[in-house]
C-alpha cells in the first residue's frame, strides 16, 4: 500500500494578483476532467507557485516537463523548497557526456558509443521510480529526455526484493537475488549499487540512496534484524521492520524473459544474415553476425551486454514499431502533467524521434545493429500525445498547437503579485546599433544593474564580446556550444556581478530568472524569422520584467509584423498591471531572489576557500572528485570518521553544484 502523505506547501506567501483566479480555473478544469488547459502566464507572475497550489488543492501526483536541464534544475529547486515534506523528484538524462554509436557511410567511419554517466542523477532517477511505487505525494520534475525508453514497469515491478523482520530466507539465495537485481558484491569498496557479506551479515547499498545503507542480520535462515546505517562511518541510524530493494538498473530482465529474448534475437539474426547475402553484402553479413553473437554471448554469461537497450524490443516482448516503455508508463492514472515553456517543449518532443531514426537506420543498413535497434527510441509525438495524462500547458507565449487543443481557451495570469509592470519598449534604428548599445549598457551598469544583449549568430556574439572586453566592460557570451553546467555558472556570475553584460542568441529567453537585469537590447529586431518572431520577441522582452527599472530596446530599421504584435501585447499587459496596481495601491518592487537558488539547493558555501578550490579545479573536476573520494575512504579506513564525513559533505556540495540543483 502506498504512503499517503498530504501534499502540503510550506510558504509564507499567499496567492495574489491573477494567481487565485488561475488556480481556481485550473482546479475546476481538472476536476471536471478537462483534458487540455493552457496557463498563459507572463514572466514574474508566479506560474510555478500557481502550479504548486493547483497540485496542493487537488492532492494529485504531478509531472512537470521542462525543455532542458537548466530549467528543470531551477523548477526542481523551487518545488523542493515549496514541498519539503513530500517526494519531489528529479528525472533527467543521466549522461554527463554522450556520444551515440553512429556510422558515417561517405567516409566509412564507425563511431563507437561513448558515455559518462552521472552517478548522482542516476540515483535520483532510481529515487523517482521508487517513489512512484511507494508514495502518492509525488512531484516529478523532468526534462524532455523522459520520453526515451527505460525498462518496462511490469519487469521492474517484479524485480523487487521485499524483506521483513523474522522472514525465513537462505543466505545463499539472498546473495543470488541481489546479483540478479544487478547489485555487485564488493566487500572492500562499498558504494551505491553494491553489497557486501560479513558472515551472517549482508549489507546492501540501495540504488536510490545517497548516504544510507541497509544491514540485514541473519540468524540461521531467519532475518534477525534490519538496520539503516551510515555506510561511511558505520553508525547505526534506524531500526527497520521492512525494506524493499529495487533493481540497480531500469533495464532489468528476469532469466526466463532473457532466455526467450535470446532465442528471438538468434532467429532475427539468421534472417538478417540471409538478407545481406542475397543482396551481395557479404561484409555487412559478417559484421552483423560477429557483433550480435558477441552480444548474445555476453547476455548468456552476465545477463546483460554493452548496448543492451538496442535489444529492448525482445526484452519487453513488444511488437516491431510499438511505443517503447518510458517514465509515462510508471505514472499513476491520476497524475497531472504540466508542460512548462510549452511553446519550446512541444516542438522538442515532436523532433526527437526523427533525428534518432535517421542514425539508427544507418546502423541497421550497414550491419552494425539488427533492425530492432530502431525500436530503442524516444516516443513519437503521436504516441506521447496519446499516452499523456490530463495536461496543463504553461507558457507566456503558447503556440498554435496548444491553443488548438483547448479550442482557443486559456487561463490568463498577467498580473504580477509584486506589482511589476512589463518593461518600457523602445525601437531605435539598427544603424550604429553597437555604439548605442555600449552607451546604454554603461548607463545601466552605473546604476548597479545587469544587461542582456541578444544577437543572431554565434560569431556575432563572440565578436561583440571581444570588442566590448577590449573597451574594459565585464562581458561574457552564452550560446549552444557552452555546456549546460557552464551556462548555469555564467548566469550565476552575471547575477553576482562578476559580469555586467551577457550576450546570447536563443538562450536568453525562456525561464531565465535574472532580477538584476534592467536592460535587454535586441539587435537586428527587424530580421524576420524564428529568432525574431513575435513569440521570441515577447519572451526576450520578458527577461527585463523582473526589475522595476527594466527597459527593452529593439534595434530595427523597419517595423515588422512581429515587432508590432510583440509591442502591442506588451503594452496590453502593461496597462492591465498599472490599473491593478492603482486599484490595490501597490508600489512595484523588483523581485528579490537568492543568487544560490539558481544553481543549488540546500547547499551553503561555508567559505570563500571552497569557491576557489572549485574554480581552480574546474578544468579537471573529475580528477579532483576522485582525489576527494580517495581521501574520504582513507580517512574512514583509519577510523577518522569525522574527517571522512566532512569530506563526504564537501563532495555532496560539489556534486549538487555540478548538477545545477
Mark where each language-model region is.
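N-terminal cationic and glycine-rich segments that engage phosphates or anionic surfaces
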Residues: 38, 91-446, 458, 465, ...
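Conserved RecA-like helicase motor-core motifs
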Residues: 38, 84-94, 307, 450-452, ...
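Conserved Walker A/P-loop ATP-binding site and its immediately adjacent core
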Residues: 59-81, 87-96, 456-459
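Conserved helicase ATPase core of P-loop NTP-dependent helicases/translocases
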Residues: 482-505
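Walker A/P-loop
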Residues: 32-54
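Short amphipathic alpha-helical segment within the helicase RecA-like ATPase core
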Residues: 73-81, 101-103, 463-467
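Pre-Walker A (Motif I) flank of P-loop NTPase domains
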Residues: 32-38, 60-61, 137, 449-450
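Conserved pre-motif I regulatory segment
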Residues: 1-40
Amino acid at each position: 500500500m502506498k504512503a499517503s502523505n498530504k501534499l502540503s506547501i510550506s510558504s509564507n506567501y499567499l496567492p495574489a494578483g491573477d494567481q487565485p483566479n488561475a488556480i481556481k480555473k485550473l482546479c475546476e478544469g481538472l476536476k471536471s476532467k478537462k483534458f487540455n488547459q493552457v496557463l498563459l502566464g507572463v514572466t514574474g507572475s508566479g506560474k510555478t507557485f500557481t502550479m504548486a497550489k493547483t497540485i496542493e488543492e487537488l492532492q494529485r501526483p504531478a509531472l512537470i516537463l521542462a525543455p532542458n536541464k537548466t530549467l528543470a534544475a531551477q523548477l526542481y529547486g523551487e518545488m523542493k523548497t515549496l514541498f519539503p515534506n513530500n517526494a519531489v523528484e528529479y528525472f533527467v538524462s543521466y549522461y554527463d557526456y554522450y556520444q551515440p554509436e553512429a556510422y558515417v557511410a561517405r567516409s566509412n567511419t564507425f563511431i563507437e558509443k561513448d558515455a559518462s554517466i552521472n552517478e548522482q542523477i542516476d540515483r535520483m532517477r532510481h529515487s523517482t521510480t521508487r517513489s512512484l511505487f511507494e508514495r502518492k505525494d509525488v512531484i516529478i520534475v523532468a526534462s524532455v529526455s523522459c520520453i526515451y525508453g527505460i525498462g518496462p514497469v511490469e519487469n521492474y515491478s517484479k524485480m523487487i526484493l521485499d524483506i521483513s523482520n523474522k522472514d525465513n530466507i537462505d543466505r545463499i539465495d539472498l546473495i543470488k537475488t541481489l546479483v540478479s537485481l544487478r547489485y555487485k558484491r564488493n566487500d572492500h569498496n562499498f558504494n551505491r549499487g553494491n553489497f557486501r557479506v560479513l558472515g551472517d551479515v549482508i549489507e546492501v547499498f540501495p540504488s536510490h540512496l545517497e548516504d544510507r545503507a541497509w544491514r540485514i542480520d541473519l540468524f540461521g535462515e531467519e532475518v534477525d534484524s534490519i538496520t539503516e546505517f551510515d555506510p561511511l562511518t558505520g553508525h547505526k541510524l534506524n531500526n527497520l521492520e521492512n525494506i524493499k530493494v529495487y533493481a540497480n538498473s531500469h533495464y532489468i530482465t528476469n532469466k526466463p524473459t532473457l532466455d526467450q529474448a535470446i532465442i528471438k534475437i538468434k532467429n532475427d539474426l539468421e534472417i538478417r544474415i540471409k538478407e545481406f547475402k542475397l543482396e551481395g553484402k557479404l561484409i555487412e553479413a559478417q559484421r552483423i553476425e560477429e557483433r550480435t553473437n558477441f552480444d548474445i554471448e555476453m547476455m548468456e554469461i552476465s545477463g546483460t551486454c554493452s548496448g543492451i537497450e538496442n535489444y529492448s524490443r525482445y526484452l519487453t516482448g513488444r511488437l516491431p514499431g510499438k511505443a517503447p516503455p518510458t517514465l509515462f508508463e510508471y505514472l499513476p492514472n491520476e497524475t497531472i502533467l504540466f508542460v512548462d515553456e510549452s511553446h519550446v517543449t512541444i516542438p522538442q518532443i515532436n523532433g526527437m524521434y526523427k533525428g534518432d531514426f535517421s542514425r539508427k537506420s544507418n546502423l541497421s543498413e550497414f550491419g552494425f545493429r539488427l533492425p530492432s535497434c530502431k525500436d530503442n527510441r524516444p516516443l513519437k509525438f503521436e504516441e506521447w500525445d496519446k499516452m499523456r495524462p490530463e495536461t496543463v500547458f504553461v507558457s507566456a507565449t503558447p503556440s498554435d498547437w496548444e491553443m488548438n487543443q483547448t479550442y482557443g481557451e486559456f487561463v490568463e495570469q498577467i498580473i504580477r503579485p509584486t506589482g511589476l509592470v512589463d518593461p518600457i519598449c523602445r525601437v531605435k534604428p539598427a544603424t550604429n546599433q553597437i555604439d548605442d548599445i555600449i552607451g546604454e549598457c554603461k548607463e545601466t551598469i552605473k546604476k548597479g544593474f545587469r544587461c542582456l544583449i541578444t544577437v543572431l549568430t554565434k560569431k556575432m556574439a563572440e565578436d561583440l564580446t571581444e570588442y566590448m572586453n577590449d573597451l574594459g566592460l565585464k562581458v561574457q557570451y552564452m550560446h549552444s556550444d557552452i555546456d549546460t553546467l557552464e551556462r548555469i555558472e555564467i548566469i550565476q556570475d552575471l547575477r553576482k556581478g562578476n559580469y555586467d553584460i551577457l550576450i546570447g542568441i536563443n538562450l536568453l529567453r525562456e525561464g531565465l530568472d535574472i532580477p538584476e537585469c534592467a536592460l535587454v537590447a535586441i539587435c537586428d529586431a527587424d530580421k524576420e524569422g524564428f529568432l525574431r518572431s513575435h513569440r521570441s520577441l515577447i519572451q526576450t522582452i520578458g527577461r527585463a520584467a523582473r526589475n522595476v527599472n527594466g527597459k527593452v530596446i529593439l534595434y530595427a530599421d523597419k517595423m515588422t509584423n512581429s515587432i508590432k504584435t510583440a509591442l502591442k501585447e506588451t503594452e496590453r499587459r502593461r496597462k492591465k498591471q498599472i490599473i491593478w496596481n492603482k486599484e490595490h495601491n501597490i508600489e512595484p518592487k523588483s523581485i528579490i531572489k537568492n543568487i544560490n537558488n539558481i544553481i543549488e539547493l540546500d547547499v551553503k558555501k561555508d567559505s570563500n576557500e571552497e569557491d576557489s578550490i572549485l574554480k581552480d579545479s574546474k578544468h579537471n573536476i573529475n580528477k579532483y572528485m576522485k582525489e576527494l573520494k580517495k581521501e574520504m575512504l582513507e580517512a574512514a579506513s583509519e577510523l577518522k570518521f569525522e574527517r571522512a564525513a566532512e569530506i563526504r559533505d564537501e563532495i555532496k556540495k560539489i556534486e549538487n553544484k555540478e548538477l545545477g540543483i
